[in-house]
Amino acid sequence: MTKITRDQRNFKFETLQLHVGQEQADPTTDARAVPIYQTSSYVFRNCDHAAARFGLSDAGNIYGRLTNPTEDVFEKRIAALEGGVAALAVASGAAAVTYTVLNLAQNGDNIVSAKNIYGGSFNLFEHTLPQYGIQTTFVDFFNEKEVENAINEKTKALYIETLGNPNSDVVDIESVARIAHRHKIPLVVDNTFATPYLVRPIEYGADIVVHSATKFIGGHGTSIGGVIVDGGKFDWEASGKFDSLTKPNPSYHGISFTKVCGPAAFVTKVRAILLRDTGATVSPFNAFLFLQGLETLSLRVERHTYNALKVVEYLNNHTQVESVSHPSVSTDPKQQELYKKYFPNGGGSIFTFDIKGDAQKAKDFIDNLELFSLLANVADVKSLVIHPATTTHSQCTEDELLDQGIRPNTIRLSIGCENIDDIIQDLDEAFKAVA
């Protein structure tokens, strides 16, 4: 193998997911696969070299909590797939969301978030961050006036998901980005459910993209991790709202991250300050597993999507189903329009449906499934199911559940890569059992 020297920006997605970050075989061993660098620390050539690394004037490995060669390949690859300038892998998707908000907001600040988001993120915003003085206003992002009215001088970000959890509703990223930039604040998008194979939020104006890498990126339910991608386009200096990025930072030699790190200032500060001080570091082994997942991301997402649309069609025509929450069958013309705009190749293999009956009927249906695994993860190659009201969103009040489109008879499905006939047969048998 010779070194890839051609401009990788011309490569297609399927090629990028295989090669970015490892343009030649491992220089030490000639290994073709990315090695797992299972080390806690790195040797410096001399004291001046060590000082340069710690001062950020010489890019390179300092300590395992901050950087690792295996993680570096993963970070470069996901940044390229999302169209960002840099990325940071962390220990979980929850850590990615938490670090992103803490890098933007301080005591007395707030963010504006969509109502329909992952239950863990909702709980973080509603209950945990307020203990540190950071408030969240939850709004309907389909109502631009409501979004505008929620923003004030202390608002530091807008936060949405490309496909809402758990109902796969689609937000107009481009429109929301315009609102954010009009107020000189960044748009943060959780792209976990869509993946960059289906949509790249940065191309529509998003500034920061986060993922739970545990889901589609890993794809096999083997590892926990998260990632933050810096779009590199937001002008932190011109905004005037983010002194911790633009002013001399007393905890890091008095440097200004925007001046020293340029377009990658945001994610570099997360690494240099938050990751350094709080240590939610992804393991090298998990980074290796995520790289294995990325290599087949496009293939898996194609199958997930094909199967999901078949299941949606089946459920939408079933006599025991009250409703299906999926943008492809939405009765809302705006949802149909947004789905076609952002997902021309389909999407939304994680969605909900309401079975006719009460909560017990929903639980009985779930308990009669055999192919589907009842667990809290999603986006596995295996099909999964859960009852959101009593699990993933159980921290929410009844009103909060209804605001997020979750009722007692709501069931969430994550459609896997099995043969579609077997998936539908399993659903059919469960419906017969509770008829």
Feature map (PLM): residue ranges:
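Conserved PLP-enzyme active-site core in the AAT-like
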Residues: 2-9, 17, 21-25, 87-317
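PLP-dependent enzyme catalytic core of the Aspartate aminotransferase-like
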Residues: 1-3, 14, 85, 126-127, ...
